[in-house]
Regions:
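N-terminal secretory signal peptides that target proteins for export/translocation
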Residues: 1-5
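General helical structural elements
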Residues: 9-10, 126
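Bacterial N-terminal signal peptides
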Residues: 10-19
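Scaffold/interface architecture of coatomer-like assemblies
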Residues: 23-519
Length: 519
């Protein structure tokens, strides 16, 4: 009997439950859709070069990889001086506004600019700096030195006297003068290998300096401007033939012959233009725009590929000739006072690590749009490899870790060799109060001088036991695998890195003898 009652009770509950559910409104399903947006900073001017301030979303079109993309929003960003912000915004609002104020990074190329050219330009450079400060800009001055690499001369400042003192003390490099004199004294030997190699070293250091600069300034909020002041990179002088007529073409047609040490395979063919492309991609990834002023007498100034390329690809501008300072000042003030920030929906909803071409059009008649050429979304490993590549290009610039290195090539049968060597590493530099650095990553790269081949090895060095035992030095011996090496001279670059960001690099040379004809 109990079983029957129980069944009847459950049946009643079931009917009531169904009736109750039917009486309720059935809830609708909700699906969250996350739309990924990309930000573009663009400058729009009329035919006379004046900024157009009244554009709306419908005035713009954004194309990615040739396809029209939806625009989510368009905002006119107006940059203010520090003084204006502090005077007109209270408390927390002022702190927010200060993150995106009128600021410019000024990079003086004291590596490629000879001492005479820089000395002649000091007056114009001082006037440019002071005029920018008068307009409300704060300037961060940096210099690219032959030995020190990238050096910060002062943080963002509007102190006219201090900035003028720094500019007045700038010194150019004597090496370009010596190389030019050597080249001119032997016009029949202009393709001399040793001379060209010295010019190419300057060129590699230039690229390394730019690769150093980008991570240094990337944290500055918003659109970041770099004004590069230089007499130009030694591109023509680094070519296999310094006489472009003899080479059978102009500078641009020959520049692909310039090849750099690329142990990490960042580029397809290790060429100079490909490295510039990497610099442009990294700059665009971090919203950095290059402007260039090329120093030198009017009749001596030739178009510089690097300045032209980087400014064009990052949405900036490049100035040379008689009116370079006047025109440069006008455009730099204009572009760093107002710009449009466009948020659009990219083609891919996930970061794919590929380059995406971007083009921005304005429907306003006569409008001219300056924008970044495109973007690559890098992963952290990609960025780390680019920092290492910079160290391999200019070993002198990376001296954060102190060590000595030696190596030699030993025969390993036939035309094969192994490299054996030692690192002498002081350990005191890895002892910290809070935490010791216990592991280093050791890279060795071997570069064939004809740039046809690169060999790269990597190893982890464990310092923990030696540090615990209180040792002052570590002698680390290494041996490479068998390498097939032709007779000739090879550059060997040894790089040490640790997790706190420090990098130390040494550049060595080895000679592989030619055994042909020997008994």
């Amino acid at each position: 009997m109990a079983g029957v009652k129980r069944a009847f009770f459950l049946a009643i509950i079931s009917v009531i439950s169904v009736a109750f559910l039917l009486a309720q409104e059935i809830p609708r399903e909700h699906h969250e859709v996350v739309v990924r947006l990309k930000l573009l900073d663009v400058i729009v001017t009329d035919a006379d070069g004046n900024f157009i301030p009244d554009l709306l979303r419908d005035d713009f079109q954004v194309f990615e990889d040739g396809r029209l993309r939806p625009i989510e929003s368009v905002e006119l960003v107006t940059l203010k001086s520090r003084e204006d912000i502090l005077a007109n915004y209270p408390g927390e609002a002022a702190q927010q506004e200060l993150k995106a104020r009128k600021r410019i990074h000024v990079l003086f190329d004291c590596l490629n600019t000879d001492a005479i050219t820089l000395r002649r330009a000091r007056g114009e450079l001082s006037r440019l700096v002071l005029n920018l400060v008068e307009e409300g800009f704060e300037l961060k001055l940096l210099a690219l030195h032959p030995k020190k690499g990238l050096e910060v001369l002062c943080d963002f400042s509007s102190d006219k006297e201090h900035l003028n003192e720094i500019v007045s003390a700038l010194e150019g490099n004597l090496t370009p003068l010596f190389l030019a004199a050597e080249r001119d004294s032997s016009p029949d030997q202009t393709s001399d290998f040793s001379l060209r190699l010295q010019y190419q070293e300057l060129l590699q250091k230039s690229i390394s300096g730019l690769l150093q600069l980008i991570p240094m300034i990337k944290e500055t909020p918003g659109r970041k401007t770099v004004l590069l002041i230089t007499s130009g990179f030694p591109e023509k002088e680094s070519l296999p033939y310094l006489d472009s007529e003899k080479a059978g073409g102009g500078l641009i047609t020959q520049i692909d012959k310039l090849k750099f040490f690329d142990p990490f395979g960042l580029t397809r063919n290790s060429t100079y233009p490909e490295f510039l492309e990497e610099v442009a991609h990294l700059a665009n990834f971090n919203l950095i725009t290059f402007y260039g002023i090329q120093l030198g007498q009017v009749e001596e100034v030739e178009s510089n590929f690097a300045l032209s390329y980087l400014s064009k690809k990052t949405g900036g501008a490049y100035f040379r000739g008689a009116n370079k300072f006047t025109l440069g000042e006008k455009v730099i003030k204009r572009d760093n006072s107002r710009y449009y920030e466009i948020a659009y929906v990219p083609a891919s909803q996930e970061e794919d690590g590929k380059f995406h071409q971007v083009k921005v059009k304005c429907k306003r008649k006569g409008a001219r749009v300056h924008f970044r050429d495109g973007y690559v979304e890098y992963e952290e490993e990609d960025l780390a490899n680019r920092r290492l590549a910079s160290a391999f290009l200019a070993p002198d610039f990376y001296q954060d870790i102190s060590f000595e290195a030696e190596t030699e090539a030993r025969p390993a049968g036939g035309d094969h060799f192994i490299l054996q060597g030692k690192l002498h590493l002081p350990l005191e530099q890895f002892k910290k109060e809070d935490k010791m650095v216990e592991k280093l990553t050791f890279f060795i790269g071997i570069n064939e001088m004809n740039q046809e081949k690169v060999h790269l090895g990597q190893q982890e060095i464990d310092l923990s036991e030696d540090l615990r035992q209180g040792k002052k030095y570590l002698i680390y011996e290494f041996t490479t695998t068998r390498l097939k090496l032709k007779p000739g001279r090879y550059g060997v670059v040894i790089t040490l890195t640790c997790k706190d960001g420090r990098t130390g690099t040494r550049h060595l040379w080895i000679e592989i003898p030619d055994k042909r004809g020997t008994s």
